[in-house]
Amino acid sequence: MIIDSKGRRIIPPSARRFMIVTAIAVAIFVVITGVVIFVTRPPTSDSAATFHRGDWQAPPEALLSSPMRVRPVPGWRVRMTDLGLPESAVFADTELTHEAEPFVGAMEKRAYFMAMSTTDPRRWLVGLDLSTGRPLFSPVSIDPGPDFVKCFVNGPDQVLCAADGKPEGKTATIAWVVDTRTGEVVFNGPTDLHVTPGSGSHLKQVGSYVVAEIQGKGLSGVGPRAETTWLIPDAKKVTPTNRNADTAAPRLAVAEDLAGGPDHAVVFSVVDGTVITPDLGADRTPERAVVYPQGFAILAAGKRGSGLRDTVLFFDNAGNRVGESGIQGSLSDLSMVLPMVQSAPSYTVFGANGAGLIQLPGEGLDAVLIGHRLYAPESEWDGPVKVRRWRQFDLRTGEEGTACLPNMQWYIANDGQVGVFETSQHETTGATFFGMDLTTCEKLWTVPVNWESFHRLWRIDDTLVELSDDGKELHSLVAPA
């Protein structure tokens, strides 16, 4: 999020969609208008196989269940009074509209939100069935007093909330663990785990689980009494956090492995802490790793004096090696859907099986990946007046499609044919969200947004959910009847 000098929101929070930045140099290719199309190379005795594009399939997407070709209208509606909450309540975790992030997380069609009173310190956890908008349980009171509270999804049936206070200048944290099947608070008490960075231990949302980074110890799972469970000694800086993509969250994560030496990476399960130890071959070390829905990739660095070049290796979720780039380049951690390798002045997209898909010139800072489509801007964004073309490519074939003119930078969701995007208040259109045909690039409808309000827009599972300007109503957005 970017805040201007007056503390106002510039970039919509729901627009935190991943951006693609990567590149490589390729040995075998066909150049077509600046685009490299990969061809099949069979394995040899001294190299790993590369895959034909036909072996690759795009990761399954969470598509919107309601068509977006016509401007959507509210479906189910939930207001504070429907939940038995006071008129002073809003869906928010702070009264600062540009900083409010009420959406906690979701497990399939069960979504969780924070609500707060604007006249006193009361807080609540709200659970909704996305199919109907009906409450999953009565709002759960979370009473942190004056302290800020943050909540996390922790596995399929729990939400963990924690509030840091500083009595006598030392961080002290109270935790609430809620059974999301019943709304029962199964634990409420002190914990050694904190939500404030720099406090010795820091809770983070990683996929659908909470991971605690504990200074001087490592990374730990968190149990039903806000206690530590599994431990990966000396690991830190876990990724991905705050992941927003159309694909299911990976069950694996990556961290720096200080125990393994400098510049080492460790891949592990966020469910039980199991460390995945793939075979990199002799004289190679895992310098960087990135996880994806269908596996992970590792930048394997040749040890000094080994004569081996750095290479990117591809693995499935079990750690079985499925491919190798066969080229040098830096593995990008800015895409959490498909492997990306960078080597100026171009960037390249790979399939999770190691199949080279496409290579484009430039840095691609704002490129957007939607299913099997890649949209790459032709130039940097120089200001609100400039209109740039977005080149469209089908990753299944490498063919270039219709170029798009609407700003696609802040992507939200799609129904398979129509994408939904946001714009900021500084663009010529002002703050809006709009629908665009993903094939023809035709803008189909536009809705203006009050960017100084509580308004938010999320894709949660297969549902588009909107928060009203006053923060008092959540509703689904669906095709008109």
Curated annotation (Swiss-Prot):
What are the transmembrane regions? 18-38
Query: What does this protein do, in the record's words?
Result: Involved in DNA conjugation in the recipient strain.
Key word Membrane present in the record? yes
Q: Does Transmembrane appear among the keywords?
A: yes
Q: Which residues form a coiled coil?
A: none
User: What is the protein name stated in its UniProt record?
Assistant: Uncharacterized protein D806_5234
Localization per record? Cell inner membrane
Domain of life per record: Bacteria
Q: Tell me what topology the record assigns in the membrane.
A: Single-pass membrane protein
The further comment given in this record reads:
In the well characterized mc(2)155 strain this gene not present; it is part of an MKD8 strain-specific insert (RSR-II) between MSMEG_5168 and MSMEG_5169.
Knockout phenotype, as recorded, reads: Loss of DNA conjugation when disrupted in recipient strain, strain still secretes EsxB.
Keywords for the protein's UniProt record, in alphabetical order: Cell inner membrane, Cell membrane, Membrane, Transmembrane, Transmembrane helix
> What is a single cellular component term in the Gene Ontology annotation?
plasma membrane
